[in-house]
């Protein structure tokens, strides 16, 4: 089995359905004997360019290990899901289990927001 990194972008109006979508894709992978090494929900982010007149979308990254049949099934699911605006599947040399650079940035932003919120709470 080969290792893959999958990033898919979901329509912002469908953000509340993202956890269910992730579970569905995880079930597809594990039911065919694959493994999931990392799942990161990057949240709603600014798009680099407009897609279907949208400026923001919900990003999800998955690192998996599966066979070609499972990968074809996942790609088919992405293509025919109207909520998925774009998807990208990249073959990796080895499993990636640590946080991605994008997730590190998300964590840094959350830490800044938490630090900014603390002084206002202390003043109140």
From Swiss-Prot:
GO terms for biological process: translation. CDD domains: bS6. The keyword rRNA-binding applies. Keywords: Ribonucleoprotein, Ribosomal protein, RNA-binding, rRNA-binding. Residues 114-124 have a biased composition (Low complexity). GO terms for cellular component: cytosolic small ribosomal subunit. Residues 96-124 are annotated as: Disordered. PANTHER family: MITOCHONDRIAL 28S RIBOSOMAL PROTEIN S6, SMALL RIBOSOMAL SUBUNIT PROTEIN BS6M. NCBIfam families: S6. HAMAP family: Ribosomal_bS6. This is Small ribosomal subunit protein bS6. It comes from Burkholderia multivorans (strain ATCC 17616 / 249). The gene is rpsF.
